[in-house]
Amino acid sequence: MTLQKPKGTQDILPQETVKWQYVENVARKTFKKYHYGEIRTPMFERYEVISRSVGDTTDIVTKEMYDFHDKGDRHITLRPEGTAPVVRSYVENKLFAPEVQKPVKVFYIGSMFRYERPQAGRLREFHQLGVECFGSNNPAIDAETIAMAYQLFNELGIKDVTLHLNSLGNKESRKAYRQALIDYLIPMKDKLSKDSQRRLEENPLRVLDSKEKEDKEAVENAPSILDYLDDDSQAHFQGVRDMLEVLDIPYVIDTNMVRGLDYYNHTIFEFITQVDKSELTLCAGGRYDSLVEYFGGPATAGFGFGLGLERLLLVIDKQKINLPVDNSLDVYIAVLGAAANSTALELIQAIRKQGFSAERDYLSRKIKAQFKSADVFKTKLIMTLGESEVETGQVAVKNNFTRQEIAVSFEEIKTDFASVFKQLGSDRP
């Protein structure tokens, strides 16, 4: 039997990981500008951390979670999303304490797991960038966090992304809207999908989020949640909209958007783009002002978003964006004969210690094959080391692009390779 990776997973090979690393580094730099620090939480959590916070009736919990009992009979789940683990960590580590500066801003990058049908940009193990901000209910936080995602897309050169915006209001507003939605949907219950018939009993707002054709038709003329917002909820949402306009970030109001997680209130948003004539959600998030309290902490406002790396890279590929990744090699040493083997290793280590990337031949190949490898690696400088070079203590170093060549002593290579690099038309990396 041939052993293969599990369905819905992928091997990310070196020629692709450089793109991932570039995107992750751009994200880190962008988040740092907004004073976010990185947090790393376990890849698995107690089942209740996810089920109770995300919602027992959500598709994530009822259909998509990877959960199991470990050898100590503890109910464990691989994390399907990043917010609940971060909130658990915020409470467990008492980041709400008065000595901790507020708001607390953190970001994470890591694997998430959901059992769903694999397709382009959607895998069972996927990678997510996410941010969470704790300690302020100021609508400026909502607008700033949305602006940060918008800036990240701009930094990466991604175009044609539309911001969809909605408000779920506070608890009282949602309660009033929930009843209005039930009253609207009950007469057409038999026309809904089986899942939405169940949702109507458990959490009717979920029907708005259904992708089934019959459900979309049913909610086309559903009442708008914006008509049920109380004064405080309206003021908060208007504040967010006003600030987005100040920041010149265009948006559309999408009253059917509810998000797939139960902990949201007030502002929710998605950045959506088109891929092969289909809508693709690139980034989504919102406000969750009761989640910290739910985990046993004090009442604390929260706002954040999650962004799928696979989807982001898919859009970058579809939009033919050339990421400025550098796979080139500074130095390649072609090695001729056993007499040069030890010296080649000594020189290449000295070059690396001075901050340069370097590679050499280890396979005793013919010189033509070694030069071909240097070209494949997009090598800037090449040196050929054989028995005569070892005897004289110097070697010819050649610019692989201009063909300029100089003779350099081993001692200079070991102590000041930067000057050699510069003489041949390159600057220190």
UniProtKB/Swiss-Prot annotation:
It is found in: Cytoplasm. It catalyses: tRNA(His) + L-histidine + ATP = L-histidyl-tRNA(His) + AMP + diphosphate + H(+). It comes from the Bacteria. GO terms for molecular function: ATP binding; catalytic activity, acting on a protein; histidine-tRNA ligase activity; transferase activity. The keyword Aminoacyl-tRNA synthetase applies. PROSITE patterns: AA_TRNA_LIGASE_II (PS50862). Keywords: Aminoacyl-tRNA synthetase, ATP-binding, Cytoplasm, Ligase, Nucleotide-binding, Protein biosynthesis. Its EC number is 6.1.1.21. Its main location: cytoplasm. GO terms for cellular component: cytoplasm. Homodimer. Belongs to the class-II aminoacyl-tRNA synthetase family. This is Histidine--tRNA ligase. It comes from Streptococcus mutans serotype c (strain ATCC 700610 / UA159). The gene is hisS.
